[in-house]
């Protein structure tokens, strides 16, 4: 069973609604009503009632007639004159009379029958019109049967416009195409909304990750900053060896090599050159000798590990073999404590040298590697 829904919008026109940006056809298609019919029907005001003067009634006195032709003329006159019903009939009709076949068949009545029939109608019709008010206006509002002056304008009935077959097919085609166009636009809009939501979520996630990374890096930088600040801090180290009193501007990143090199100057050991007979008391002087006497040669075999563990060769060209340039563990600890006893809390103990640990200068690359390792240890 097919049904339809009718919606009436009063006091508006389609043109006014379109000027306001409301297209009823598109709205209905958007909410899922592709088959719709929108039209504009005028509503005419109701016809005004025209008052006409009442027709004065024609006086008609009841007469006794016996001829059928007279009875027919009386009934015709009563139909033409009496346009309004009786207000009330209070007269009693008395008893019912049988059918008079004589009058109906047009037979000649007898004198006795005519006399009796003349007496009865008089008694029956007596008082029939006593309560009738011919001037009474019994019209009910809205039920007037007066014919207006222009019946064609008053009897207009709105009807659906009948379209030709070609126009109907064209209308259906345009409606289906517009409907499919609206569907594609809605689908594209939904896709755009989904893509925008995904982009917003991705941006929110990226910003959250960036904030977490920034806070983590801030904490790492704070910890590393304190460590770097302590490593870059400048300390004045004074040698406490009797009769020395030399002061060094020392930093943690310089390492202990320079301090050990100074402590070796207070021993009886000589460091020989491997290329000639030159001897000196520390590594710095040996490096200076290489720069002047052997500029094309690399300085090798004079590191911390070689001086402590005895890995370097003992005899050089022109060097007496009885001279021992190595430093024993006990002697190294004694020299270290005699020189830096008041700065042990900064420079630490000499145990690292004795155990053969290789202390190197903190270069930029090593510093970055160390920071990376510290950050990894902090994260895990």
Curated annotation (Swiss-Prot):
Region (Disordered): 137-187
Keyword terms, alphabetized: DNA-binding, Metal-binding, Nucleus, Zinc, Zinc-finger
Biased composition (Polar residues): 142-152, 171-187
Locations listed in the record: Nucleus
Gene Ontology molecular function: any one: zinc ion binding
Cross-referenced PROSITE patterns: ZINC_FINGER_C2H2_1 (PS00028)
Chief localisation class: nucleus
Transmembrane parts of this sequence: none
C2H2-type Zn finger ranges: 271-294
GO cellular component terms listed in the entry, alphabetical order: nucleus
Protein name: Putative zinc finger protein C02F5.12
Originating species: Caenorhabditis elegans
């Amino acid at each position: 069973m097919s049904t339809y829904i009718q919606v009436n919008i009063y006091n508006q026109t389609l043109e006014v609604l379109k000027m306001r940006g409301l297209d009823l056809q598109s709205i209905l298609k958007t909410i899922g009503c592709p088959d719709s019919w929108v039209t504009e029907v005028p509503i005419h005001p109701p016809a005004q009632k025209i008052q006409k003067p009442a027709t004065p009634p024609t006086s008609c006195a009841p007469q006794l007639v016996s001829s059928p032709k007279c009875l027919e003329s009386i009934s015709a006159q009563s139909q033409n004159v009496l346009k309004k019903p009786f207000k009330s009939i209070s007269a009693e009709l008395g008893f019912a009379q049988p059918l008079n076949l004589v009058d109906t068949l047009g037979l000649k009545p007898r004198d006795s029958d005519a006399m009796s029939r003349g007496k009865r109608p008089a008694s029956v019709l007596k008082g029939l019109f006593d309560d009738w008010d011919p001037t009474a206006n019994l019209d009910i509002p809205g039920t007037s049967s007066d014919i207006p002056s222009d019946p064609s304008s008053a009897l207009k009935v709105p009807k659906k416009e009948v379209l030709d077959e070609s126009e109907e097919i064209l209308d259906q085609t345009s409606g289906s195409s517009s409907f499919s166009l609206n569907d594609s636009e809605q689908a594209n809009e939904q896709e755009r909304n989904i893509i925008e939501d995904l982009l917003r979520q991705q941006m929110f996630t990226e910003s959250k990750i960036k904030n977490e990374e920034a806070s983590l890096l801030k904490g790492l930088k704070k910890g590393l900053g304190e460590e770097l600040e302590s490593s870059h801090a400048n300390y004045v180290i004074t040698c406490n060896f009797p009769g020395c009193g030399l002061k060094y501007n020392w930093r943690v990143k310089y390492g202990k090599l320079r301090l050990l090199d100074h402590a070796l100057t207070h021993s009886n050991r000589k460091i020989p050159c491997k290329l000639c007979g030159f001897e000196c008391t520390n590594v710095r002087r040996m490096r200076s000798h290489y720069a002047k006497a052997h500029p094309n040669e690399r300085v090798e075999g004079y590191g911390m590990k070689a001086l402590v563990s005895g890995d370097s060769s003992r005899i050089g060209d022109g060097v007496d073999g009885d001279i021992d340039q190595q430093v024993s563990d006990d002697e190294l600890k004694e020299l270290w404590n005699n020189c830096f006893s008041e700065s042990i809390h900064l420079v630490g103990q000499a145990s690292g040298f004795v155990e053969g640990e290789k202390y190197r200068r903190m270069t930029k690359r090593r510093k970055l590697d160390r920071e990376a390792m510290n950050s990894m240890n902090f994260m895990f």
